Amino acid sequence: TLMRSSAASDVYKRQVQGVLRFLGRGGGQVFPARLTVADTALDVRAFCDTGFSVQEPLSSRAVVLVRFGAVQSRLPPALGTYLEQHFAGAAPLPVPALGVRLVPCTTVAGHCILPAVPASLCCTGSPAGQGRAEHLYAAFADLPPPPDGWEVLVGVEAGEMIHPLRHRQA
């Protein structure tokens, strides 16, 4: 069973890396942001990737991708424990009290399901009241650190809420 969990974990990591490789495009810069999940504010390094686009299927809300290892020690204990069990291959049922939903991601590399919770994100370098993306979902992925060190990957929809002028075409 442990061997099966390890193999499933390896397949999962390859699938999520495929999400990033086939949906993602480089060229942006990492910026300071504050991600709020489960009533906990986390200061993070975010990266806006114009090729990343995932929505929570029931609400159609934008999803940001969070590297679990980068924020694991700062999460509320109940959420951290749930995510640890999920990434260990235990496949726990979503916890309604945490607002966990399972978000499907599909690429040419395959299909994976990511645990996600309601979230908001703001750029900490913007004036108060500006640059805030509300009503998002933060999907967690067990990924190694990328070369540029981002902790949260933001797609165009959430990116436009945070930096409204940066993404508009002339």
Report the location of each language-model feature.
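Single conserved hydrophobic/aromatic residue that forms the stacking wall/gate
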Residues: 1-8, 12
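Membrane-water interface at the C-terminal end of transmembrane alpha helices
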Residues: 13-21
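A short secondary-structure junction signal
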Residues: 22-24, 45, 57-61, 75-78
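N-terminal signal-anchor transmembrane helix
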Residues: 25-30
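Aspartyl protease catalytic core from the pepsin/retropepsin fold
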Residues: 31-50, 83-164
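Acidic, Ser/Thr-rich low-complexity segments on the non-lumenal side of membrane proteins
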Residues: 38-70
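Electropositive
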Residues: 60-99
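A juxtamembrane structural motif centered on a specific transmembrane helix
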Residues: 165-170
